[in-house]
From Swiss-Prot:
The lineage of its organism: Bacteria, Pseudomonadati, Bacteroidota, Bacteroidia, Bacteroidales. The keyword tRNA processing applies. It is found in: Cytoplasm. InterPro entries: G_TrmE, GTP-bd, GTP-bd_TrmE_N, GTPase_MnmE, MnmE_dom2, MnmE_helical, P-loop_NTPase, Small_GTP-bd. The gene is mnmE. This is tRNA modification GTPase MnmE. Its EC number is 3.6.-.-. GO terms for molecular function: GTP binding; GTPase activity; metal ion binding. (6S)-5-formyl-5,6,7,8-tetrahydrofolate binds at R24, E120, K159, K500. Its cofactor is K(+). Residues 256-420 form the TrmE-type G domain.
Length: 500
């Protein structure tokens, strides 16, 4: 295992306001520094205790020091008072202030989360107590940890690869059963093992092809069988394409299934968003064009996270800013998984055919629900007329009143049915990380070029160059071969919380 020389760090690992607080200490002097401020209730000092043990005791501040200048001017103080103050000084200077009674867990390198000597101090959750303990640790030689520094040290010390480290952040942020399963799957290393296996096979062929270059004078020599390499490239192409394709599902699970609420101005889109979120998220007004930019928020419905997007109303306008908002509406429609088309049922103009021409090109391959809003103001015959106009569209349709929350519960059920994402278990390998997706896309381009080079019977040095590029992209995901830049690592770990 690769160990790195570092200082010793400390941080509060638990959220404020809980009954129990935990402080993590990690580094070469973690046990020594912790023992300086900790007095065990019984037995050996902390430095002599075995790993994976819990020790009960107390955290104490250093002995108090009295300013001796107070007693230098004894001639100005009556003799009896001077003696009393000196006795008080003697008592105070020998006493220790107990901060809290605590439990301390002990881990010795390399068998800890970070791969370093580590302690975890479990105390009462008072913010005062936690800050006092942190100050004592820093006074005795610790440094306050940076965001994500514990997991970064675990990565640098070989306890996990980079994709597993990123999964830690996903696990912390998981808000549903599906996001939890995906994070756990990545943390267990299934994704990393599959990539490492592909990478090693490519390395084998690359080394054989480069060996041929050393014997370029003997053109008849062929160490790397081209048919076997072509079969391998086809297999790798299929695996990478499957992983990259899974990103659309993984991203929807992780960040919420994107649902675009679209329609004309004043159709009730913002009112619907507020009804779904059960809060006044968007401004509602009778003035046309009130929403000029997209408004997004998430909500969990029956265990499924949805990301609702309230968009600018679609209409002809000369307002430059409003037109920019309408352009973004179409962009969000292209990105959405589900589209809610809001229609003002009371609109006498009824320019539905024109709207269809604008909207439908952005809806191909997407789930759509047509919502006839303000249906509480319609007669039964009017509802029949509306249904007839849209009879040619084989999509879900629902009459609602966003303002009165009529049929909102039914809409929520239809949304869950429309989402219909595949069931996820901890053995599934599904991509949720944009960085991974982009690297896989580049790797796919490289393996395409390898296939083309083999078909065109290009020289081994040209084919091996594309092989090396594919290896590089796969290595970038898990940081094998030490090729990941310091900037990439910083961008990843700075998004972690302090204490993790």
């Amino acid at each position: 295992m690769k160990m790195i020389n570092q200082d010793t760090i400390c941080a509060i690992a638990t959220a404020q306001g809980g009954a129990i607080g935990i402080i993590r200490v990690s580094g070469p002097k973690a046990i020594e520094i912790t023992s300086r401020i900790f007095t065990p209730a019984t037995g050996k000092p902390l430095t002599e205790r075995a790993p994976y043990t819990l020790t009960f005791g107390k955290i104490c501040s250093p002995k108090r020091k009295i300013n001796n200048t107070l007693f230098q001017q004894t001639s100005e103080i009556p003799q009896e008072k001077s003696e009393t103050l000196q006795k008080t000084s003697s008592i105070t200077s020998s006493a220790e202030e107990v901060i809290d009674e605590v439990l301390i867990s002990l881990f010795r390198a390399p068998h800890s989360y970070t791969g370093e000597d580590s302690t975890e101090i479990m105390c009462h959750g008072s913010s005062y107590i936690l800050q006092q303990v942190i100050q004592l640790l820093i006074y005795n030689g610790c440094r306050a940890a940076l965001p994500g520094e514990y997991t970064q040290r675990a990565f640098l010390n070989g306890k996990m690869d980079l994709s597993q480290a990123e999964a830690v952040a996903d696990l912390i942020a998981s808000s549903s059963a599906s996001t939890h399963r995906l994070a756990m799957s990545q943390m267990r290393g299934g994704f990393s093992k599959e990539l490492s296996n592909l990478r090693n096979q490519l390395l084998h062929f690359t080394s054989l092809m480069e060996l041929e270059l050393d014997f370029s004078d003997h053109e008849e020599l062929e160490f790397a069988n081209r048919d076997e390499l072509s079969s391998l490239a086809t297999h790798i192409e299929q695996v990478i394409a499957r992983l990259a394709h899974s990103f659309s599902v993984g991203n929807a699970i992780k960040n919420g299934i994107p649902v675009a609420i679209i329609g004309e101005t004043n159709a009730g889109k913002s009112t619907l968003l507020n009804a779904l979120l059960n809060e006044e998220k968007a401004i509602v007004s009778d003035i046309h064009g009130t929403t000029r930019d997209v408004i997004e928020d998430t909500i969990n419905l029956q265990g499924v996270t949805f990301r609702f997007i309230d968009t600018a109303g679609i209409r002809q306008t000369n307002d430059t800013i409003e037109n920019l908002g309408i352009e973004r509406t179409f962009q969000k429609m292209d990105q959405a998984y589900v589209i809610l088309w809001m229609i003002d049922s009371t609109d006498a103009q009824r320019r539905f055919e024109e709207l269809k021409a604008d909207i439908l090109p952005h809806c191909e391959g997407k789930k759509m629900i047509i919502l006839f809003n303000k249906s509480d103001l319609l007669l039964a015959t009017q509802k029949e007329e509306l249904s007839a106009i849209f009879a040619d569209m084989k999509v879900e349709k629902l009459f609602i009143s966003a303002k009165k929350r009529e049929n909102i519960t039914i809409l929520e059920k239809k949304l869950v049915q429309a989402a219909a994402l595949p069931e996820v278990n901890q053995n599934d390998i599904i991509i949720t990380n944009v960085r991974h997706y982009e690297a896989l896309t580049r790797a796919l381009d490289s393996i395409h070029r390898v296939q083309e080079g083999l078909q065109l019977e290009l020289s081994g040095d040209l084919v091996s160059e594309d092989l090396r590029q594919c290896i590089h992209e796969l290595s970038e995901i898990v940081a094998e071969g030490g090729i990941t830049s310091e900037e990439t690592l910083q961008n990843i770990f700075q998004n972690f919380c302090i204490g993790k």
